[in-house]
Amino acid sequence: MRYSVIASKYVKALLIVGQKLNKIEKYGEFLSFVKNIYESFATFFNNPIVKPEQKTLVIKQAFEEVFKESPGEAFLNFINIVFENKREKFIPQMQALYKYAAIDIENKILVNVKTAVKLSDQEIKVINDFVEKYVGKTPVIEETIDESLIAGAVIEFAGKMIDVSIKGRMDKIAKEVFFLRKG
């Protein structure tokens, strides 16, 4: 997915505010919630007849209904500016960019783990310890289930890929056999 320059500028602004208010992680959760609301009610939020204040009010009411609290004036102002400037179509991009920028700014590292079955807490801890020792940053694990791996895992972080899956082993063996037959 190509991210727009517009979305990245909004994300940068929200990160600055989040850092000052010590709410980087909370704003990430809030932005994810706003993205879900936006995608569910895109017709309403993309309607030019609906005023930005009304859109912001709907977001605020949804927060109060789900979280039993307001997201705060700073976050609501951010959302209102997004609507005033007619940038709501960038909300999904903002959410994705924010997630990765927040991980970076907090000196963490994203670790993509693909497994055939859900990892146990102990397995996650082993991966966390390994990655932290390897790169010196706190890992943020994103787990994906891919039954085609049969067993094992594919771990990606810091530009590295470690494939310890059965499928990976079988592919490697198949390539070796293929090259032996060719030669």
From Swiss-Prot:
The keyword Cell membrane applies. It is a peripheral membrane protein. The keyword Lipid metabolism does not apply. SUPFAM superfamilies: N-terminal domain of the delta subunit of the F1F0-ATP synthase. Its main location: membrane. InterPro entries: ATP_synth_OSCP/delta_N_sf, ATPase_OSCP/dsu. Keywords: ATP synthesis, Cell inner membrane, Cell membrane, CF(1), Hydrogen ion transport, Ion transport, Membrane, Transport. One of its GO terms (molecular function) is proton-transporting ATP synthase activity, rotational mechanism. GO terms for cellular component: plasma membrane; proton-transporting ATP synthase complex. It is found in: Cell inner membrane. It holds the Pfam family OSCP. F(1)F(0) ATP synthase produces ATP from ADP in the presence of a proton or sodium gradient. F-type ATPases consist of two structural domains, F(1) containing the extramembraneous catalytic core and F(0) containing the membrane proton channel, linked together by a central stalk and a peripheral stalk. During catalysis, ATP synthesis in the catalytic domain of F(1) is coupled via a rotary mechanism of the central stalk subunits to proton translocation. This protein is part of the stalk that links CF(0) to CF(1). It either transmits conformational changes from CF(0) to CF(1) or is implicated in proton conduction. NCBIfam families: ATP_synt_delta (TIGR01145), PRK13441.1 (NF009976). F-type ATPases have 2 components, F(1) - the catalytic core - and F(0) - the membrane proton channel. F(1) has five subunits: alpha(3), beta(3), gamma(1), delta(1), epsilon(1). F(0) has three main subunits: a(1), b(2) and c(10-14). The alpha and beta chains form an alternating ring which encloses part of the gamma chain. F(1) is attached to F(0) by a central stalk formed by the gamma and epsilon chains, while a peripheral stalk is formed by the delta and b chains. Belongs to the ATPase delta chain family. This is ATP synthase subunit delta. It comes from Thermosipho africanus (strain TCF52B).
